[in-house]
Curated annotation (Swiss-Prot):
SUPFAM superfamilies: ATP synthase (F1-ATPase), gamma subunit (SSF52943)
PROSITE patterns: ATPASE_GAMMA
Record's keyword terms, sorted: ATP synthesis, Cell inner membrane, Cell membrane, CF(1), Hydrogen ion transport, Ion transport, Membrane, Transport
Subcellular location per the Swiss-Prot or TrEMBL entry: Cell inner membrane
Domain of life: Bacteria
Chief place of localization: membrane
PANTHER family for this protein: ATP SYNTHASE GAMMA CHAIN, ATP SYNTHASE SUBUNIT GAMMA, MITOCHONDRIAL
Protein name: ATP synthase gamma chain
Self-association state and partner proteins as the record states: F-type ATPases have 2 components, CF(1) - the catalytic core - and CF(0) - the membrane proton channel. CF(1) has five subunits: alpha(3), beta(3), gamma(1), delta(1), epsilon(1). CF(0) has three main subunits: a, b and c.
Length: 292
């Protein structure tokens, strides 16, 4: 019966683990709903500020901000968004694979790449695998604020302002639905012409309108473009947070289900071992009685 006892101990351990993963699944589901609410709440601001920036730029063609001018690409920057914690399936790995593909492409073109990492997993990745990490931020918590991101964003914007970067991208997970999250690479700077055209089309569809600018359009555009980049990075962070909780919920559900299957298999093995032990005891008793 020694083998049966060991199996029973294993079953008990797996059941305890199953309780933990089941609890983590429920916690992740609750956190995912809150993260989705934050993601949804941030979308109108990010969408509207882009629309306003595009409108001001179109209404004042005499002033072309450097954030809207294409340059010869010699160096690019990536703001890479990850989670602070693991147990989220392949969520972070998929982002890192996307960044690695991008970096490989640019290196083949003779272009240098700088990185700003948001989230402890991204910071650890670049420390372990190399890459010119110029800024990093982790420990944002479950409800990040724009102020928490300004430092890392400012480093990349300063490099762009000084001509050290010619393009700036943000890489994060896109929330498709609860079951699906996919890595996405978005160009932040220069502001893409296609995006400007889309925003202009949306403006025309909503009617003809204009603003009164104080103190002037140039000053306003200078400030709004910085806010635009910050809002896009913040949107990426809160969307990635929703993806993290969804991925963790699915991962913990799979772990709970797998634990259940393993328990079923072990209980079958346990019952067979117990049956074999009982059969052996009966055989020994019968054999002893026959000898007498």
């Amino acid at each position: 019966m020694a083998a049966a006892k060991e199996i029973r101990t294993q079953i008990g351990s797996i059941k305890n683990t199953q309780k933990i993963t089941s609890a983590m699944e429920m916690v992740a589901a609750s956190k995912m709903r809150k993260a989705q609410e934050r993601m949804t709440a941030s979308q109108p601001y990010a969408r509207l500020i882009r629309r306003v920036v595009s409108h001001i730029a179109k209404a004042n063609p005499e002033y072309r901000h450097e954030y809207m001018i294409e340059r010869e690409v010699k160096r690019v920057g990536y703001i890479v968004v990850s989670s602070d914690r693991g147990l989220a399936g392949g969520l972070n790995i998929n982002v890192f694979k996307a960044v690695t593909r991008e970096a490989k492409y640019w290196h083949e073109q003779g272009v240098e790449v700088d990185y700003a990492a948001i989230g402890s997993k991204a910071n650890v990745f670049f420390r372990n695998h190399g890459g010119n990490l110029v800024a990093g931020k982790s420990g944002l918590g479950e409800a990040p604020a724009v102020d928490d991101l300004i430092g890392s964003v400012s480093v990349m914007l300063k490099a762009f302002d000084e001509g050290q970067l010619d393009r700036l991208y943000v890489v994060h997970n896109e929330f498709v639905n609860t079951m699906t999250q996919k890595p996405i690479v978005r160009q932040l700077l220069p502001l893409e012409a296609e995006a400007e055209a889309d925003d202009e089309e949306e403006t025309r569809a909503s009617g003809s309108w204009d603003y009164l600018y104080e103190p002037d359009a140039k000053t306003l555009l200078d400030h709004l473009l910085v806010r635009y980049v910050e809002s896009q990075v913040y949107q990426a962070v809160v969307e990635n947070a929703a993806c993290e909780q969804a991925a963790r919920m699915i991962a913990m559900k799979n772990a709970t289900d797998n634990a259940g299957n393993l328990i079923d298999d072990l209980e079958l093995v346990y019952n067979k071992a117990r049956q074999a032990a009982i059969t052996q005891e009966i055989s020994e008793i019968v054999g002893g009685a026959a000898a007498v």
